[in-house]
Amino acid sequence: MSRGKKLFLMTVLLALSLGVSLSFSQQDTALVCPKVRELLLTELSGEIAREHVIHISRFDRIQASAGWHEAALYIMEQLKRYGISDARIEGWPSNGEIKYYTWTTPVGWEAEFGELWVVEPQRMRLASYEELPTTLVKHSVSHDVTAELVDVGSGLRPDDYEGVDVKGKIVLATGYTGDVHRQAVIKRGALGVITYMAPDSRRYYPDLVQYTALWPRWSERDKVGFGFNISREQSSMLQRWLGQGKKVLLHAQVKGKIYESKIEMMSATIPGTTFPEQEVLICGHLDHYKPGANDNASGSAGMLEIARALQRLISRGQLSPPKRTIRFLWVSEMYGTIAYLKNHPEVSQRTIANINLDMIGEDSVKTNSYFYVTRTPDSNPSFLNDLVENMVIHTSRVNITSPRGSRFPFNYRISPYGGGSDHYMFTEGSIGVPATMFGHPDPYHHTIQDTVDKVDSTELKRVCYIAACCAWWMANASDEEALSLAHEVAKRGLGRAGLDLCRAMRAMDDSTATPDELYTAYKEGVNVVKHAFYREFSALRSVLLFVEKEPTRGYIRLLEENLGANQRFFLREVEDYYGLLCQRLGCPVRKITLTEEEKRAAKLIVVRSEEFKGPLASGYLAEKLGDETIEEKLPLRGNIAYETINFIDGKRSLLQIRNAVSGEYRPVELKAVEEYLRMLEKAGLVRIEERR
């Protein structure tokens, strides 16, 4: 029997066994069934979600604070009212010294008052905590001082302070307040810090007042000063006076304290009936400054509304209880999440996927924004990407609005992996939970201008609808649903691999290349294609999580074989193109071989230490290695550094890790990868062993 006939017969038999219609009439391409979509679309309310945003944004709810706890109690009260009775708050010690893996916990903080006044050359108020809460930098402690102002530029580097006496003075800087505070106050005896957004940051918004914190260690508590945030417009006035040679005298009054606290999380569930030990996780960080409306009262409120809608539909009998548990997790961003993962190691095994809701309610016109979804990184390929993308596309074709919301079309992007929120904790290599983020870029993010008037009930409803549909699908999927998803993953995966093939071709397509440069580009191109298919094979296999019947498994194996055939075709295409370009250059075709450096790297296996789980915290290497400039010396940064660590599994060689991150992003020097991993080894985070 020919392969084509075999595949067709397998398709027919499987479709009949699962009761799938083979009609080729116009089809609904959404993976979530119409009945569930209709019920959720009717029940979910952007108006109710926005009302919760209003309530949550009234709390000044930074991590490890009483305000966070009060906001959590508000959510717990609503959950109980909706019939979800198992909500609970957990907490773990947090004091600026205790670590969970590489992450140092924040101190607790509370404040009663904070004002900053100009005394000379003219009296005027610059900042008031009561009026605008973000003007007082979090973790500021009680002071009542009058002191001279000194401009220290960024205030981040030692050379910013050369020839400048800051002791007993207040410094003005553009750097992050916590870092400036450590340099100016803790190390050099300044009294306090005033910071503003640098000129190249959100340049069209000169009146923004940012949210920042000092992040002191508990051992530094006797040296902690204070900080105020002002607008760029206000800073220009101060700099103008200083530039004119005028003495600028300020009066700062703060009533605040830091203390040993707890970092808290709150969870609630809709229990599963068939596979209760398997969990679909919806999370979002509850913390932030007051108001923090879109960031992230919107995500916290959206979770609450999804929980309400699902529980209401179940209690009415319109939906049956889910087969798998749906867990809602209101987190303290990053610091609480890592503490939760440390104290709940079962998360890695129980959680099949995570949807992180962070800034989901933007009015797209007022914020000049759009909705985006981040894909999982290549170190953690998953069906989740295609399930979510399918629902996002479906939502863009449905006229979803809210009574008091906007009527604008749904503007969205599907983005490559990016961090910056709690999904980055879950999808990290040692945790291994596929995770995506739903969010919006927003110029008002982390500023006092992140207010409720910029929250759109229509956008809230749309995003809640996508999240609820995807969560419900995962909580109930079995063979029939898995088959549809497998098709989606395989076909979209082939398209993604095709784009990577184009990237490989373009890398070779340089008319000025030498034969050696062309060979290197060819070698990298082959790596790109192989990596692309590794990613897509892994994503397709992840669908097997929902499969119980052998015919479905067999069909998915056939889809894998088809992917394999396409991989061979793509690699042949790269090889043929390389041959053509060699012919043009008049040089011989070279076979791919390993250099001596690559042969050595292929024998080196990288192993994580048992205590190194979760992402590497910023500042940990500086603290561990005793070099505060270490971050500037790192040969790898950002997503490439993150993925380099994620690909460490105790089996991959140094060369394989280098090839993986190069296939995902761009060619990375093997020397840079080894240098970075050697730094981690020196810090006790990994071991590099020779393969025996």
Language-model-detected regions and their locations in the chain:
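Short helix-loop-beta-strand segments that form the rim/entrance of peptidase-like active sites
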Residues: 51, 309-339, 347, 357
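Soluble metallo-hydrolase cores and metallopeptidase-like ectodomains found primarily
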Residues: 32, 109, 131-160, 214-294, ...
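Extracellular/luminal Protease-associated
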Residues: 54, 66, 127-226, 295, ...
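Short capping segments at the starts of secondary-structure elements
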Residues: 645-656
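Bacterial N-terminal signal peptides
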Residues: 10-19
